[in-house]
Amino acid sequence: MVLETPVCSPIDKESSSDDVQLNKPPKKKRKLDVVYPPRDNTSSSSDVKPKVPGYCGVKAIGCNRSDELLAEVALHSYNSQTGTNLELMTVTQVMLQSVAHINYHMILDAFDPANNSLSSIEICLWDAAVKNNEKLRLVTTFCSLEGSGDKGSQWDPNGVDVLYTGVMPKWLDDGALSGSEKLHYYEVNDSDLQENKWLHLYAQVGAYSKWDLGMVKHFPLEIKKVVVQTMEDDIESNLKLKSSNAIFYITFTTSGGVECACIIRQTRNGRPQHMCLEINNVEMDK
């Protein structure tokens, strides 16, 4: 069995390879201040809750919005597998390697709203060569707390459920949600969109696939509809969003009112930290 991806482990800070570009800002002490609002005569101590101000950290030289988007994808993989809700604050280190495409090693600061704390996360994401008629393929193979001692491993395509392999699916048929296969689909409601903010990230990934860094000219995006499909017969509708393997059909509009659509196939191969997103853009009928 031949594995197609490099092994992605924690960043080798001593590497001096000529084909590695390291953007590393000087280290600074960082502190996340907690600001307490002033009390008034009617407030009790239990009414006062800390507010966390916007955190402005050190951004790596040369780090652009697409780098941050890829960091968010890897962080989403981490959150979905650990049950956390960490939010990207800033990318502090970027190292690029050319390995059958581009391999991103990053260190980022992530905020945990559960306890108002910052964590330093190491990630490795592969902007991989396409193979299933998709336009973009993003493979996360490492995402862990910095200094955890965890090691990365190669992406094993043979570990992916065969129901989610092969050529990318076409856009939904008109009767998909009411036909004989309707139990395989779930149309996401507004409360799901509010609760699962990563769906907005997936829409941005669709924009990145379509426009690359030019996506920022079309932000903010507004999601119009999301349908999630699972191939198994025994996954209830309200659990499809939590499925390790799923296909997302997303329509959204840009800030300029352009309506767009994308298909994102999300797969995992059973290895910790691993996730693959295959993305296609769909031309909407005029």
UniProtKB/Swiss-Prot annotation:
Span list, region Disordered: 1-49
InterPro entries per record: Cystatin_sf, MS5
Lineage: superkingdom: Eukaryota
Gene3D superfamilies tied to this protein: 3.10.450.10
Database matches in PANTHER family: BNAA09G28770D PROTEIN, CYSTATIN/MONELLIN SUPERFAMILY PROTEIN
Recorded family membership: Belongs to the UPF0725 (EMB2204) family.
Protein name: UPF0725 protein At2g20620
Organism, as annotated: Arabidopsis thaliana (Mouse-ear cress)
Record lineage: Eukaryota, Viridiplantae, Streptophyta, Embryophyta, Tracheophyta
